[in-house]
């Protein structure tokens, strides 16, 4: 954990409805029992900490199921983070970004991540050039999805990688650029 590596960790749980999913409640209870982590549950007014260039914000405000633009305090929080000089790491998907079509989204209410760590597969939104400013660099974390689950999941998309291209066109890069010398 970050605290074991000597980092100071502050965690904020935004809970204006005072209702949490079972998973969220379980994780809240875990955090409450961790001595080295400062935990704040925000249910009313919130005065955000001052963010500096040396800070890292780990964005887990909203996940991949979001289907409407952020508004109110959540949009204000996103704008505050985006205006800071802190490094931003988004978990799964930058908060405020829809997983696919963002044409009806509010770009001012989407986290601008420096790095996005996503699970299993990249979201379609990561591959669209208009979302690069929100996603930043992205990495897929293997969560050991069963191959049968992957094969049985319907999709109309196929991700073509450099390895796929190299298998079809096994010409080396130097041969492709030979005309430039």
Regions from the PLM with identified roles:
Residues 1-56, 67-72:
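A cross-family phosphate/adenosyl-ligand binding-site feature
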Residues 54-177:
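YjeF_N-associated NAD(P)HX repair module
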């Amino acid at each position: 954990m970050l605290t074991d590596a000597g980092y100071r960790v502050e965690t904020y749980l935004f809970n204006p409805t005072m209702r949490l999913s079972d998973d969220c409640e379980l994780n809240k209870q875990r955090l409450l029992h961790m001595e080295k982590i400062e935990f704040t549950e925000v249910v009313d007014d919130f005065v955000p900490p001052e963010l500096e260039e040396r800070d890292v914000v780990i964005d887990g405000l909203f996940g991949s199921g979001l289907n409407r633009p952020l508004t109110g305090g959540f949009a204000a929080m996103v704008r505050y983070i985006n205006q800071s000089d802190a490094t931003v790491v988004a978990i799964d998907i930058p908060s405020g970004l829809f997983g696919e079509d963002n044409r009806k989204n509010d770009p001012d209410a989407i986290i601008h991540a420096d790095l996005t760590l996503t699970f299993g597969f990249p979201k379609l939104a990561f591959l669209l050039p208009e979302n690069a400013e929100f996603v930043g660099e992205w990495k897929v974390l293997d969560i050991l999805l069963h191959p049968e689950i992957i094969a049985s999941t319907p999709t109309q998309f196929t991700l073509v990688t450099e390895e796929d291209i190299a298998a079809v066109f096994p010409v080396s890069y130097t041969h492709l650029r030979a005309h430039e010398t």
